[in-house]
Amino acid sequence: MAMPRKSVAIIAAMPRELAPLLRGVPGQLADSVEFFELENAVVAVGGIGRIAAWSAAEAAVKRYQPSTLISAGIAGALTASLKVGDVVRGSEVVDADSGARFTASGGESVMVTVSSVSGPEDKRLLADRYKADVVDMECAVVGAVAREHGIAFLAVKAISDEFDFEMPPMAGFVNGNGKFETARFAAYIAVRPKWWSTLRQLAANSRKASMNLSHALEHLIYEYANTTQEEKIPRA
């Protein structure tokens, strides 16, 4: 069902990635996607990974007819110069699985989308192969949807894990619907104390990244909600 048109649709994996932006905004579940309607934008939260991102982006386009799609969330750094909380805008997004490349508006960095969380060694390989600055798990899919529908595409990420950060083994706890199985992961971690301090640090990093990302998105929503379609070129 079509809803009142929103010129900006933001696609995210989890609500907590944009917690400050969404504070006090009720979510509406439709087609397995949770929608948060802001004054000049809608946030579509579909889950982690490619399939979830595709579902959220397609549902947002169908329901709200946006002229701009923004892939937003927390991500990993592929260069030592990027620090926790830094907000990065992409100029190009590479799909590591297919090799497809998508142009994003207003950015200066290369981002690469992968299918699983990357540790330091994987990050080094990705940086060397793609000359990329940032790694995530959804961005390229949003770029593909934007290209298919002929609308503007932005990639905006905030760093939660730096280049040399050793991520906990979280990939195996994402179910087929892109949802993170928190209870099962907690049971796994409870008997593995070597990861406790890492998780505390990651939680603090993610809160900082979420705050900075939300502030950046507030400015972008205002900018793109008051910009004509012609001014949004280049498109995906």
Question: Whereabouts are the PLM-identified features?
Answer:
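Extreme N-terminal starter segment of soluble prokaryotic enzymes
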Residues: 4-9
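Short hydrophobic segments within beta-strands
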Residues: 11-13, 44
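Helix N-cap/beta->alpha junction signal
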Residues: 14-15, 139
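Short N-terminal binding/cap micro-motifs at the start of the first secondary-structure element
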Residues: 17-21, 52
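Glycine-rich phosphate- or other oxyanion-binding loops that anchor nucleotides, phosphorylated ligands
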Residues: 31-236
